[in-house]
Amino acid sequence: HDDAVGQQLPDDEVLGRAVAVEETAAVNAEYLPIFIKRGIAAELLDEKLAQFDLARLAAELDAGRDYQFGYLGLQTLYDRYFLHIKERRIELPQAFFMRVAMGLALNEIDREARAIEFYQVLSSFDFMSSTPTLFNSGTCRSQLSSCYLTTVPDDLDGIYEAIKENALLAKYAGGLGNDWTSVRAMGARIKGTNGKS
């Protein structure tokens, strides 16, 4: 039998992998509802996730897709993306993808069907959402945007308000772009102080 890199695998390793996938599938199916309830109780997940048919979604989890990851990919998910309580990760890879998919499907008419569709493309790596979506989808802070563009007004209050807004937006992993064209040039007259900028 050949694996992904074309090396010969002994039959017992192939069988062992098949058993591992089957065992992982059972764990995933049992784990998803527990994970959702625990995440809601810890105020990490949106309470609306409990309204999904969790058994139906759990049945769609494909444990074999965990084997698509290389070490670095899985470690990156663990270090940066998986939800945690006091540094203890509470997400498994397939639960992570389903949580993101559920968050994206919250307002859909047939949310379970849409969540399954989103899960299929995410977990198969056919499409990968941006970092803010992976961080925040399905959570209590469902900010999914990757980038914010703002215009900074030409007055002191407006400039400091723009800085405050940037800090609040950056908190949830969105990129920032500011249009400063309305701010007067260096050396221009400041009416309120009769000075120069």
Regions picked out by a protein language model, each given a short descriptive name:
Residues 1-197:
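Extended catalytic cores of very large enzyme megasubunits
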